Amino acid sequence: SFKNKYSFYRNKGKENYSMSGENTPNYNWDQLDEKVTIEAKEKANNNDYQIDNTYYDKYIREKYDQLKNSSKNTKYDDSKEYEDLDILLSIVKDLNIKMKFAIIPANGKWSDYTGIDSATRQVAYNKIKEIAQNNNIEVMDYSNKEYEEYYMFDAMHLGWRGWIDFERDLYKLKK
């Protein structure tokens, strides 16, 4: 969430850095990863999926049993969204816009529980990579992080450690 991102910048003692990216601080990424892991252990400790406690309590807890295998018929091999993505990225290519595209993973444990197995998810990741590559778009691929601890906030949004990886890669672009 924006609040989490704002807090990340605010609480690291980097308030004086320009948000324009002109001056990128030299973060100790390993130290930040350790710090957010400690925070995540406190904020995602009421479930087996390392989902944020508040999110889990609000959206999952009461219907947990009903959600088992609830998405088992989900398929990612044919979707209108792929065509939309291809159109967008082809426009980016035609306009000679230099960009990178991030593939964000699903929460592997949670997806498995709801019936979307790894092979099914891999279809989506591969299709997205293919579309990006066909349009000469460089990909920052995090799909192999599905089972990394505290990587995701919920089922589909980057969490504590995921943001550290993403931020580190963004800073590499600027440096």
What are these regions (language model features)?
Residues 111-175:
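Long, positively charged, glycine-interspersed low-complexity recognition regions
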Residues 63-68, 103-106, 129:
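Generic detector of short, locally flexible boundary/turn motifs and exposed helical patches
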Residues 70-72, 80-81, 100, 109-110, ...:
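Long, well-ordered mid-to-C-terminal structural blocks that present hydrophobic/aromatic surfaces
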Residues 91-116:
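Active-site segments of SGNH/GDSL-like serine hydrolases
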Residues 1-91:
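Secreted/periplasmic serine-hydrolase-like ester/acetyl group-modifying domain
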Residues 86-100, 130-138:
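A structural motif corresponding to the C-terminal end of an alpha-helix
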Residues 84, 92, 99-102, 167, ...:
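Functionally constrained cores in energy, signaling, and assembly domains
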